């Protein structure tokens, strides 16, 4: 995939290279939406390479795990599992973003090369 990837419905992004950024806006629901989650109890979803940034706004019930993100991760009023990712930019949480614990066996924490306001 090349360019900015705008998500407004249920995304399952597994094992892909996104040449650009991913934007997830106002997406909520069940089952859990997934942007990488190799240890999911329902199905394995390999992590992704996102060359740009990951932006999430007002979205919930997400797993974002084991991805390599070339830019920053910007989270605004979201609820999600966020584990085992590598961000070459910053990890920024705002407006009450909630980071949920992952399932047993999930990696813990994220590697962030810039500022981290989510801890």
Outline where the language-model segments fall:
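A generic structured-segment signal
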Residues: 11-12, 43-44, 62, 80, ...
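Feature marks extracellular polysaccharide-active and adherence modules
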Residues: 2, 8, 14-15, 19, ...
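Short, surface-exposed beta-strand/strand-loop-strand elements in extracellular ectodomains
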Residues: 34-39, 84, 99-107
